[in-house]
Curated annotation (Swiss-Prot):
Keyword Secreted: no
Annotated WD repeat ranges: 12-51, 57-96, 97-136, 142-181, 188-227, 246-285, 297-331
Positions of transmembrane segments: none
Protein name: Probable cytosolic iron-sulfur protein assembly protein Ciao1
Pfam families (alphabetical): WD40
PANTHER family: CYTOSOLIC IRON-SULFUR PROTEIN ASSEMBLY PROTEIN CIAO1-RELATED (PTHR19920:SF0), WD40 PROTEIN CIAO1 (PTHR19920)
Keyword field: Repeat, WD repeat
Domain of life where this protein originates: Eukaryota
SMART domains (alphabetical): WD40
Amino acid sequence: MGRLILEHTLQGHKGRIWGVAWHPKGNSFASCGEDKAIRIWSLSGNTWTTKTILSDGHKRTIREVRWSPCGEYLASASFDATTAIWSKHECTATLEGHENEVKSVSWSRSGGLLATCSRDKSVWIWEVAGDDEFECAAVLNAHSQDVKRVVWHPTKEILASASYDNTIKMYAESALDSDWDCTATLSSHTSTVWSIDFDADGERLVSCSDDATLKIWRAYHPGNEAGIATPDKTTVWKCVCTLSGLHTRAIYDVSWCKLTGLIASACGDDAIRIFKESSDSKRDAPSFELLTSEESAHEQDVNAVEWNPVNVGQLISCSDDGTIKIWKLQE
């Protein structure tokens, strides 16, 4: 069994904190919340301090922040129905089009595409068209309810979205006409899918839900060794593992570490849990074990968790309790 060691507890935001995002270099992070502000934090000696407060971009709660792969830009998704793009501490673009709250934003691996999703049930894909210019490339209406999260595949231009309609959708650009299409629907959860994350090579996806389960999905490509049928020669995603009975309330976020393969979950029962793939895990029927559980990680709902992309075993979390915590996993 491992354990999570609390390294830092940080305060600064007023009200609940919705999102945290490590910078690609792993030496700083951004946070956002109810106070309509984004804070950029970095390490000075052994202390994390707020270096910048970005407070003039949004009129309502900021739900999520995400750095571009190059680390030069930050995107923020807000309940004011806009997405802001920040560079060098200034808002350089505002993306408008959603009718309601924007819940999530994600950059593609190349940094050339941005995805957003909203309570208006739509997913938008934006092309970076030049300096501070973004053009809408697609509006995707595949979900029947509020869309909670969008995440790009780590190596391909494939987008995943999670929704209040209990499903996950996959999207890709058609080779024929350059239109974006929904290529797969992943159905197994019995309630809202709050968050999703790909593993390092993008062949698997983890999802977390209001149904208090984590699910692992695997991609089966045309001609796969397992003999899984792939209609129309399109990739099929199958649920290959369900982790149930370990969370007592809704699971709001999940992070699949690209360095270690460990999965962290953020739960409405105030806990953070870490899962490790079993040594005897099978490709088409994987098994995961609970490595450690930090039962009272926060005093209220844990809204987000994210593994540091560079510093192995470092985890960040934020909560309704108004704090950000930085943890180190000891295995």
